Amino acid sequence: MIIYQIFINNFKWMKKYMFILSIIILASCGEKNNPILIALESKNTKIKKIINNVDEHELQIIVSLINKNKKVVDYKFNLNADNYYYPASTVKLPISVFALEKINEYPLINIDTPYKIENDTAFYTIRKDINEIMVMSNNEPYNRLFEFLGQNYINYKLKEKGMAKSKIYHRLETKNAKNLETKELTFFINDSVIKFNKSYNKKTEPLKLNLLKKGVGYINEKGDLVRESMDFSEKNYIPLEELHNLSKLLFFREQERKKNNLMLSENQISFLMKSMNLSPNEIGYNSEEYPDTFSNLLVYGDIQKPINGIKIYNKIGFAYGYVSETAFIETTKSSITISIALKVNNNQIFNDNEYEYEEIAFPFLAEFGREIIKIVESN
């Protein structure tokens, strides 16, 4: 038993050593211009905490830049669309896009048309919903848009956009999250109304990917600890590269115009971009409680004060110990699109709200974002 444990410990050490060595070799050879590898070579402890256990943290990264020929160049690290990770609230970006596309099918409806949803007396608008989604990552407006669209429409749209491996199964943090029946919505236009009746959606096939069974336990809906792996086969999924490609359609529109199949007007894209750059204060939240950098993890995950000359348009998500972000970072010298995902769950128990977000994930994202800006601008 002692010999076996020594072997396991040595194997883990060697695996970690070989991984770090591979980064150094790649950064010094054919991949020497890859800003991701250069950033991951950093001696900063915020970076090293993740790199020293990269498999455990399931780190994936994509960085896209505009080169001197005005073409998009993609740099990738550790991507594998067949390995499941939980995308959390980053799924709200495509859902927001699809909601805008759907209202375009109805000329009388726009983002400011008030609407009500079944069993709710309040009025809402698509504009306010998307602002709340992008800035505060609130689940209620996402769930309303989910009711507006339905699973079948969402998954059809994902395929239409070339997001072939992406699947959306459920609402977020609500009872009956996987209910295949959507609620009725009513839009109010002057003296008339447009009703969207309940839709009855076909059940989506479970995911067939690697790493769908995770951890050593999870907290169930009753609050009990179940001592077995958590099954993610019917959880929302968007491969990081598919999410990133959607971001490129928004932020590198000129360069990606041949691939662009977004059915949005320039005004709608401008609205969406602005929404992804708003501060909590700009949509009515107290700036002392919610600082301007509240929804930014890349660059700002460990600081609150904005840095002059940097604008970030982004969508973050974190749940079950997974943290992800897709962002467009604009400085006076560069334009960078970054998408990144990682996991921090030391005890391997899911749904217990004991994750190392503040200690490990957020500082890593902040430092990585700053490193990338520094590396890109030094070239």
Where are these regions (language model features)?
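Bacterial Sec-dependent N-terminal signal peptides
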Residues: 1-35
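Active-site SXXK
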Residues: 85-111, 338
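Short, well-structured active-site flanking segments
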Residues: 101-128
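Structured C-terminal helix/loop/strand segments within mature extracytoplasmic catalytic/sensor domains
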Residues: 30-48, 228-379
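Extracytoplasmic
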Residues: 56-58, 74, 80-82, 86-90, ...
